[in-house]
Amino acid sequence: MTLKKHRGKMSEKSNVNKKFTNSTQNNSNWSNSPSMINPESFINNPNLIVFKNWVDKLQQEFPTCDVVDSKNNSITIKIRYDDVFRSIYKEVKKSVPDSKVSLKPCNDDKKYGMCMVVKSKTIIVGWEEWGFGKPIEISGEGEFTYYIPLENVINAFDSAWRMNNKGKPLHFKFMTRRLTPRDATTKGVSAEALSSPPTVGEIWHYITIEFVTVTTT
């Protein structure tokens, strides 16, 4: 994820605009998206140590990650919502260092009642290009605030998975479930990334990865 200046009509007091852009030259824009998937290793050796090593790497990136199903040609993992948020948090902070990013209750997310809130002294544009949808923008004295529903944050996370594994013989299926509400926990999540989480129950994001055999004639 890189930044690009936006040349639009702005107040003279506004700072330089910033934009999320997709750099096709760098496939590691989203550092917390698993671009390490090697489908050939799974297909040729489905037993496997390769599987365990890959899952271990995934769990290092996402502490709440767990394998919930595995078959000869596919696996299904689940990742808790705060790990999803944390990966997006890191990318926003890397692109807009002066920003303050948090996850808070909000009425604009009709599905989960939570929003990622981004505050910055600069205008940020290009959210829709990354799958976030159009955020609710509130401008104040020298500060811009963006509210992005958690549902859209998860959609952007999924887009990153597809982007980082583009061209590989893989199919992805994504699903999100909200379990019986109880106090949310913060296992594996830094206090800076997620402070005082609201009581939302546990929201889990499921990803099925299907390894497709490529045949040649």
From Swiss-Prot:
Residues 1-32 are annotated as: Disordered. Residues 22-32 have a biased composition (Low complexity). This is Uncharacterized protein ORF217a. It comes from Acidianus filamentous virus 2 (isolate Italy/Pozzuoli).
